[in-house]
């Protein structure tokens, strides 16, 4: 069992359908996107009235990585930290809280420094990744509480490297794309799928100024040109692209906010495949 960009939706559906017991004991791999969605949906259940009994993974590398990345196994009793240093070398960038625009540059610099410690990145793609992170992180304070109705508006982000790719994930539990677009005051956006299409494929935003918006559209096209994988989830819709099958929009279990994952090939940054076998404690996908 794996909790990845492609497979986490099964767990989301179970939890959001009201399942009272979630058995994760056989999970052998989880990526940052799966980790963030699991964190958000479990906290959502903990804040509600329906208790959820979670049987956590028993595979030591997976447990070690999840804890090093900052996931609290007792989500109802532990507040998520603003940032946590990893306690094993292989946790690249643990779950980090994004609150306001003033702190975004410092967070991006921290992500960049963690990656630079591990690899000698080519300068041009490194700057591109910094711009991508700036855009995605700024989207949290700019859009997640666009209506002013979210009591604790914040986002979370995490990053991990693998043999042939780097996965960056950003997520919030805000108002979502459809509610944000509704503030344009134009025609009503009928569905979450239509909102995804408008924002990601046509470059619209809640701002009418033609100089605003289009960031997600540019990032989507960039990742696609790199033969990478990208997932953008909002409400009941998921836009998923991989180099083998292209892009498609899927119906998913409704959940508030926007959740994004990018899987960028390491060769884009001038990095060859990561050499060496994974050390003990490493959360690595099966071959």
PLM regions and their residue ranges:
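Conserved ATP-binding N-box helix of the HATPase_c
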Residues: 33, 39-41, 123-162, 220-223
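ATP-lid-like helix-loop hinge signature
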Residues: 140-183, 240-245
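Amphipathic alpha-helical interaction surfaces in cytosolic regulatory modules
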Residues: 2-77
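Conserved helix-loop functional segments at active or binding sites
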Residues: 117, 142, 146, 205
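A short mid-domain helix/strand-loop element embedded in enzyme catalytic domains
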Residues: 101-116, 125, 130-138, 159-179
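Helix-loop-beta hinge of the Bergerat
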Residues: 90-121, 178, 184-202
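Flexible, glycine-/charge-rich segments associated with ATP-binding catalytic modules
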Residues: 1-16, 76-82, 86, 201-287
């Amino acid at each position: 069992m794996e909790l990845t960009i492609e497979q986490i939706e099964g767990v989301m559906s179970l939890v959001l359908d009201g399942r009272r017991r979630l058995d994760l004991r056989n999970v052998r791999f989880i990526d940052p996107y799966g980790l963030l969605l699991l964190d958000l949906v479990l906290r959502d259940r903990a804040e509600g009235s329906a208790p959820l009994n979670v049987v956590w993974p028993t595979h030591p590398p997976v447990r070690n990585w999840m804890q090093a990345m900052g996931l609290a196994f007792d989500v109802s009793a532990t507040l998520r930290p603003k940032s946590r240093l990893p306690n094993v070398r292989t946790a690249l960038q643990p779950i980090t809280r994004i609150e306001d625009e003033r702190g975004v540059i410092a967070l991006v610099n921290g992500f960049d420094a963690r990656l630079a410690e591990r690899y000698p990145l080519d300068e041009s793609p490194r700057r591109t990744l910094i711009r991508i992170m700036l855009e995605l992180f700024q989207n949290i304070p700019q859009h997640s509480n666009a209506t002013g109705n979210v009591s604790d508006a914040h986002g979370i982000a995490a990053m991990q490297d693998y043999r042939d790719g780097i996965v960056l994930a950003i997520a919030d539990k805000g108002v979502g794309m459809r509610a944000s677009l509704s503030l344009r005051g134009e025609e009503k956006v009928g569905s979450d799928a239509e909102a995804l299409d408008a924002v990601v494929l046509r470059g619209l935003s809640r701002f009418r100024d033609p100089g605003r918006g289009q960031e997600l559209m540019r990032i989507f096209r960039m990742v696609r040109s790199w033969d990478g994988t990208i997932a953008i989830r909002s409400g009941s819709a998921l836009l998923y692209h991989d180099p083998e099958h292209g892009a498609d929009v899927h119906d998913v279990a409704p959940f508030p906010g926007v959740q994004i994952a990018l899987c960028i090939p390491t060769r884009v940054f001038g990095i060859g495949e990561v050499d060496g076998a994974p050390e003990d404690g490493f959360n690595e996908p099966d071959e």
